[in-house]
Swiss-Prot record:
SUPFAM superfamilies the record matches: PFL-like glycyl radical enzymes
Assembly description: Homodimer.
InterPro entries, sorted: UPF0210
Recorded family membership: Belongs to the UPF0210 family.
A Pfam match: DUF711
Protein name, as recorded: UPF0210 protein Pcar_2119
Length: 453
């Protein structure tokens, strides 16, 4: 393929001026062979297995970063859902497993490890229940462990008993991490239709259908897309879509090149490239800024959902043309705390929780990194989760909720997390109760569109 000098300079500009980077290289590790009735033996086998697979992950990614000159921001690990592999232990407290995961993460030098997870869309086994009950203590006693719970699928419906329980778990997690503004909640996500090959945290886990060891890559390029859209001269919306497609193609090619080289050097299988546009707190590296570049005065105003749908579709089309290994979440992320444009939109009053929910209908992944008042009830949190799960179930898409109930905060306060997690303005929730609805429990049946056979 003929490459012009202008294209080389364009790529250099993307990296140096427009925040183009590989957001994450995530190694997925199968832990099914580690199961053991004795939890101490199990923990040691989990630690040993992770160390054996991932001991060179950080060094290898840094070598490739230096080779290509492309920043790789995070190195991560995902493991088989712990609720599955720890079931044989028959222990009620699985927080020691999280500590074993954290020890392996610290010693390998990676940034986060995901997979302290349970899949409970149709019901909870004793192992699932033990894991879910252990989440608050697990996240409070570790630094790098991330947790996720899948409570709904299009095929199974919504497990409302699990949804109700997660409201309490999120509140407990916030309370146990009160000293860090409820930071534990930033490492906990509740899913509908969770993908098994997601490289992004906090929802990454190594699915049952995955190979023994795999490399999945997530790219990040909102700043590049924003610059490309703003450079257009009075474009029609079709022209904007075409511009985003071409930009996404270039971003995806770069990500695949890096991912395949990492996998080759580590003798692991290359899994997927996640096309998600993942913002950072850096100025200009914002999904909201792209929507405003299309002509919206402020993200969240009328037309925002349509603009986001255009963006999400164009990214997928451009990325799918560039790679035959697209997977994970693959869309535009709208995490409030990690996006300067979103934060400003909330502060100026154009972006509400209800509008964010509408936006999740057309992008990935859901209500992400939102802060709500510290006195928000568990039932209200569960109701927010239930709404988002319904969107995912009906539309056959992945949706999720990552909500922080920072203790002691009220509407308008800013909650600081630091690093890539940024800071979040505390947003209002509805004052009317959902308590009776959530307390009914049971299951919301799968929709008619689940009957596809």
């Amino acid at each position: 393929m003929l490459i012009h000098p202008e294209e080389i300079l364009e790529t250099i500009k993307m990296v140096t001026n427009e925040h183009l980077d590989i957001r994450t290289v995530t190694m997925g590790i199968n832990l099914r062979g580690c199961s053991h009735p004795d939890i101490k033996v199990f923990n040691e086998q989990v630690y040993t297995r992770i160390m054996r697979c991932a001991e060179k992950l950080v060094a290898t990614t840094e070598d490739i970063q230096n080779l290509y000159g492309i920043p790789i921001i995070n190195k991560r690990i995902s493991v088989t859902p712990i609720a599955i592999v720890a079931e044989a232990c028959q222990e009620e407290d699985l927080s020691s497993v999280a500590e074993a995961l954290d020890r392996a993460a610290q010693e390998t030098g990676i940034d986060f490890i995901g997979g302290f997870s349970a899949l409970v869309q149709k019901g909870m086994t004793p192992g699932d229940l033990s894991l879910i009950n252990s989440i608050p203590q697990a996240l409070a006693s570790t630094k790098k462990v991330c947790s996720s719970v899948n409570v709904a699928t299009t095929k199974a419906g919504i497990n409302m008993d699990a949804v109700a329980k997660m409201g309490h778990i999120i509140k407990q997690t916030a309370e146990l991490t009160r000293d860090s503004n409820g930071l534990g909640c930033a490492k906990l996500v509740v899913f509908a239709n969770a993908p098994e090959d997601n490289p992004f945290m906090a929802g990454a886990f190594h699915g049952i259908g995955e190979p023994d060891c795999v490399i999945n890559v997530g790219v990040s390029g909102p700043g590049v897309v924003n610059s490309a859209v703003r450079a257009l001269q009075n474009p029609a919306l079709g022209d904007i879509s075409e511009c985003i497609k071409k930009t996404a193609f270039k971003i995806t090619r770069m990500g695949e090149m890096v991912g395949r080289e990492v996998a080759r050097r580590l003798d692991a299988q290359f899994g997927v490239l996640d096309l998600s546009l993942a913002p950072t707190p850096a100025v200009g590296d914002s999904v909201a800024a792209i929507l405003e570049a299309m002509g919206l005065e402020s993200c969240g105003t009328h037309g925002t959902t349509a603009a986001l749908a255009l963006l999400n579709d164009a990214v997928k089309k451009g990325g799918a043309m560039a790679s035959s290994s697209v997977g994970g979440l693959s869309g535009a992320f709208i995490p409030v705390s990690e996006d300067q444009g979103m934060i400003k939109a909330v502060q100026r009053g154009s972006l509400s929780l209800d509008k964010l929910e509408a936006m999740t209908c057309v992008c990935s992944v859901g209500l992400d990194m939102i802060a709500v008042p510290g006195d928000t009830s568990p039932a209200t949190i569960s109701a927010i989760i239930a709404d988002e799960m319904a969107i995912g179930m009906i539309n056959k898409k992945t949706t999720a909720v990552r909500v922080i109930t920072a203790p002691g905060t009220k509407v308008g306060d800013m909650v600081e997390f630091g690093g890539l997690l940024g800071s979040a303005p505390v947003m209002p929730v509805h004052n009317f109760s959902s308590e009776t609805f959530i307390a009914r429990g049971g299951k919301i049946p799968a929709p008619i569109q689940s009957l596809t056979n």
